[in-house]
């Protein structure tokens, strides 16, 4: 059985990156929540 986590920088950035978050309304809400909470890193 293969491991489920097969890391790829491209996939990570496109799915969870800052620009991906900014592209949708719900993504912007995610960033807003993380800013309000005081997260050091908003996106991976």
Curated annotation (Swiss-Prot):
InterPro entries: Ribosomal_bL34, Ribosomal_bL34_CS. GO terms for molecular function: structural constituent of ribosome. Transmembrane segments: none annotated. GO terms for biological process: translation. It comes from the Bacteria. PROSITE patterns: RIBOSOMAL_L34. Keywords: Ribonucleoprotein, Ribosomal protein. GO terms for cellular component: ribonucleoprotein complex; ribosome. Belongs to the bacterial ribosomal protein bL34 family. This is Large ribosomal subunit protein bL34. It comes from Acidithiobacillus ferrooxidans (strain ATCC 23270 / DSM 14882 / CIP 104768 / NCIMB 8455) (Ferrobacillus ferrooxidans (strain ATCC 23270)).
């Amino acid at each position: 059985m293969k491991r489920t986590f097969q890391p790829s920088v491209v996939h990570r950035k496109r799915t969870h990156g800052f620009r991906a978050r900014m592209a949708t309304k719900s993504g912007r809400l995610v960033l807003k929540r993380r800013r309000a909470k005081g997260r050091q890193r908003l996106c991976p």
